[in-house]
Design a protein with these regions (language model features):
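Active-site beta-loop-alpha junctions enriched in small/polar residues
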Residues: 259-261
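Conserved small/polar residues in nucleotide/adenosyl-binding loops
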Residues: 270-277
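Acidic, glycine-rich loop-and-beta core segments that form the ion-binding/anion-interacting portion
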Residues: 263-265, 273
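N-terminal accessory segments
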Residues: 1-39, 68-71
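FAD-binding subdomain of flavoenzyme oxidoreductases
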Residues: 102-106, 111-257
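Glycine-rich N-terminal segment of FAD-binding domains in flavoprotein oxidoreductases
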Residues: 30-100, 115-117, 136
Length: 277
């Protein structure tokens, strides 16, 4: 039987301040409101407090304290998700990973990178591309979403057609468990047959099994050239038949997207109106 969660009190606030400093503990109305929503439509749950640790040690101490006091913790990143995964439905603590935002190491020899979960997807992609390396997962919010959130949701984008999604590029994770224990889930190798596959268990778990504090990503060589084609079809059926024909011909496009005439007309109209004003 699940015990009733405890409310955050003054003693709890003082304890959090002692762990991470008063500048990283927030309980003002404006901050609580900002962290009560993500991009999920018409959902809002207010936390009782927002805390912003900077490393796994601080997170471990916070989790141990909350575990002892039965205070719920909801980890969050950039809050760009559409499934409500970062919403504190039980109140309690919202733990933001935004200060864990370092690209720790780029291992060009082994095509790997070690990063913290608060790094923005596009910032990471641009960083590795300067070294002729490629991190393919490209969710629609890549300009603002955090890599930690991508892991929590197993995010992907149009390029998943050829390259796969987030889970296909994760080698190893540092995770703080609900007990406060800090573990690594795997090894920095492509083939690892030792024990349970804890790395993939954590990917897509939406913060319910632990808080990810470091990630080792696999990278691939940057494609030398990209070509974009726009092909009109007289019907949706013909477009779908073309997709099947492309794959049967042995071609593997990076992405394929379908646009209806109404959508194209709307974009054209908006572009025209922008020039008129």
């Amino acid at each position: 039987m699940i015990k009733k969660y405890s409310k955050v009190n003054k003693t709890d606030i003082d304890s959090f301040i002692e762990i991470i400093g008063k500048n990283n503990v927030f309980f003002d109305e404006e901050t609580l409101k900002n962290y009560s929503t993500d991009h999920t439509e018409n959902l809002s749950f207010f936390p009782e407090i927002v805390i912003k640790p900077i490393n796994s040690i601080e997170i471990s101490k916070i989790i141990k304290y909350c575990n002892k006091r039965l205070i719920p913790i909801t980890p969050c990143g950039a809050r760009t998700g559409l499934s409500g995964g970062s919403l504190p439905i039980y109140g309690g603590v919202t733990l933001s990973t935004e200060r864990l935002n370092k690209i720790i190491e780029l291992d060009k020899r082994n095509l790997q990178a070690t990063v913290e979960p608060g790094v923005i997807n596009k910032v990471f992609k641009d960083f590795v591309e300067k070294e002729n390396l490629f991190y393919p997962p490209d969710p629609a919010s890549q300009g603002s979403c955090f890599l930690g959130g991508n892991l929590a949701e197993n995010a992907g984008g149009p390029k998943a057609l050829k390259y796969g999604v987030t889970k296909d590029y994760v080698l190893n994770l540092e995770v703080v468990l609900p007990t406060g224990e800090i573990i690594w889930t795997g090894a920095n190798v492509l083939k690892n047959s030792t024990g349970y596959n804890l790395t993939q268990l954590m990917v897509g778990s939406e913060g319910t099994l632990g808080i990810i504090t470091k990630v080792v990503f696999k990278l691939i060589p940057l494609p030398k050239k990209t070509i974009t084609l726009l092909v009109p079809f007289k019907s949706a059926e013909l477009a779908c038949e073309a997709v099947s024909a492309i794959f049967r011909a042995g071609l593997n496009p990076c992405s394929l997207e379908f646009m209806e005439r109404d959508a194209i007309n709307s974009v054209s109209y908006t572009h025209l109106r922008a020039h008129e004003t």
